């Protein structure tokens, strides 16, 4: 993080503001280590949780940019219009979807994705007790990650059909964003 010094940083996972340990780890680290101007994109619904906000308040380098995660579906032309207004995004199942959607609204000609590995299906297992485990490898913890239950926003374990449905939604969202990008000439 300190070597890359990103100008733009986006979070999407609600567990970052719901789970106290994750909240403290992320926001305290951002506040302590961000010594350059950075725009931090945070979903509007994160504003309901006030506990992370004081952690960032003392760092003038961090500019909060609030984005709308209202899931938009329908006729592509209507979706494009809503995306351009910033009133919503394709269903934001993962951080890539709002990142791409917001990136398309910024003055970039091209968006390059790095570390966006989606080999999810081979990473799913179901135990004899019908508990779904997923080995969610991220580029920053590939050697340390282990198979674990998938935690939903309500902090309960997700069922297999829910996980597979969310994968479907994510992949569909990528195609919606591709059509939007083509419409923008990007």
State what each model feature region is.
Residues 1-186:
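Metal-ion/cofactor- or nucleotide/acyl-coenzyme-handling active-site neighborhoods
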């Amino acid at each position: 993080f300190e070597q890359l010094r990103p100008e733009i940083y986006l979070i999407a996972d609600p567990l970052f503001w719901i789970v106290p340990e994750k909240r403290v780890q992320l926001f305290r680290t951002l506040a302590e280590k961000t010594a350059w101007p950075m725009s931090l994109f945070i979903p509007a619904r994160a504003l309901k949780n006030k506990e992370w906000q004081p952690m960032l308040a003392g760092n003038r380098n961090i500019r909060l940019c609030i984005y709308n995660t209202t899931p938009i579906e329908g006729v592509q032309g209507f979706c494009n219009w809503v995306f351009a207004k910033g009133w919503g995004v394709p269903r934001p199942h993962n951080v890539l979807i709002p990142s791409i959607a917001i990136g398309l609204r910024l003055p970039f000609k091209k968006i390059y994705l790095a570390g966006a590995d989606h080999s999810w299906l081979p990473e799913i297992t179901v135990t004899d007790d019908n508990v779904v485990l997923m080995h969610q490898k991220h580029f920053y913890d590939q050697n340390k990650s282990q198979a674990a239950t998938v935690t939903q926003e309500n902090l309960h374990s997700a069922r297999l059909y829910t996980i597979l449905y969310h994968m479907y939604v994510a992949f569909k969202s990528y195609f919606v964003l591709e059509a939007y990008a083509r419409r923008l000439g990007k």
